[in-house]
């Protein structure tokens, strides 16, 4: 049995070292692992994800956070404004990051491509439902029904309601430049 140094159990909150009393096998208590003087924990990682700090989450995990989804039909607005997106129905019980626009890598059809993804309600178009979609750079294949994996690399910006479609398109152009130039 392996337990963290701060694991507790039972109504009287027994600690990990007490497990040896109740468990007949070997008990290994893992010491704390620190990052910048703070304990790395699932709570800390979840907080980073839920606040959109996907780069920090990746540093704590040791690998990029990822989410899988099945490509479904959306409203096709992205295509009409020059930024086609793969609209995703999440299939894992993973945490999506906070609403925003992100630099991502997208694994599709066995290859990885740089892109940008958004999580949010598309308020510029008065959206009310949460959307999870990715613009995959230099990619134009029909992938409806395929499962793709999004690797969250860094947050570009918060979701914003733009005054016009033109203002949105101008911002998406800037987002694309940032995403294409992003380095680890």
Question: Language-model segments: what does each one mean?
Answer:
Residues 2-84, 107, 163-167:
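Classical nucleotidyltransferase
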Residues 74-184:
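Phosphate/ribose-recognition catalytic cores of enzymes acting on nucleotide-derived substrates
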